[in-house]
């Protein structure tokens, strides 16, 4: 009970980060009362938030957010009771999870989120056209494979030897994730192999953007 319920954890043990409103502005503090900046997971609020160098909580699109020793683009809610919380889902044709834009590394990448398969480019933009794409996947040796897309959702991926339906891709994603069912509290990057292998590139709700102290 008590404040222990509000703890998140890193390699060094418990880390308590809470959002506190001061004169109409939100700030983040650790268990020692020290103001925090950067990307923070606030368990009591159930999400990720970003605080600038002055400690102010940011909303909207934020570029160059440090995460896993690299910089990414994030989007943080601006309304609807989740002000400042990392956005989950599609916004302006970009795919986000816990605020982090889901970018391909070099070409195009498949993602399984909330029951559907999406294909994004290096800027996290969801592709809408059915055509050939160079997909980042260790199981695809060909440079270009045919991807059928309808209403932004991938319907099938066809290599020279096999066609994978959306249902096939969902099963592959769930096998990679290691759970019976991937919920909307997770996103799976289908980048390892188009086979049923336990080689997960998945990211659970609390495992994205964890800041170490």
Task: Give short role names for the model-derived ranges.
Residues 1-213:
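Extracellular adhesion/carbohydrate-binding repeat motifs centered on closely spaced tryptophans
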